[in-house]
Amino acid sequence: MSVYGLLSLLIFIVLAVNTSNGDPGKDCSEKEEYLYDSSNCDIFYECDESLKPQRMMCGPGTGWNQDKLVCDFLTNIDCTRGGKVAPK
């Protein structure tokens, strides 16, 4: 695994924090599906086994990369699709 891939995986595992249940305004069609938040790049939703979206938050300096389905460095993501990054 490349250093970049390992770093991305580490960022996802360590810094993605389950903050609370949420509603992204979208429905889950299958479990383990990921949805981006339309108003905040720091937030994404993971669909649980009951097809309910669970609000997750990326760590500092990262945002949700919907193409790769990981929290990624802000320079690597298109934040126009996922809204603004929350102030730190």
Swiss-Prot record:
Key words, A-Z: Chitin-binding, Disulfide bond, Secreted, Signal, Toxin
Tissue: Expressed by the venom gland.
Statement: the UniProt record of this protein carries the keyword Signal: yes
Disulfide bonds: 58-71
SMART domains: ChtBD2
Ranges where the Chitin-binding type-2 domain occurs: 25-81
Signal sequence interval, chain numbering: 1-16
Domain of life where this protein originates: Eukaryota
Entry GO CC: extracellular region
Protein modification: Contains 3 disulfide bonds.
GO molecular function: chitin binding; toxin activity
Cellular localisation: Secreted
Keyword Repressor: no
Family: Belongs to the scoloptoxin-01 family.
Protein name per UniProt: U-scoloptoxin(01)-Tl1a
Organism: Thereuopoda longicornis
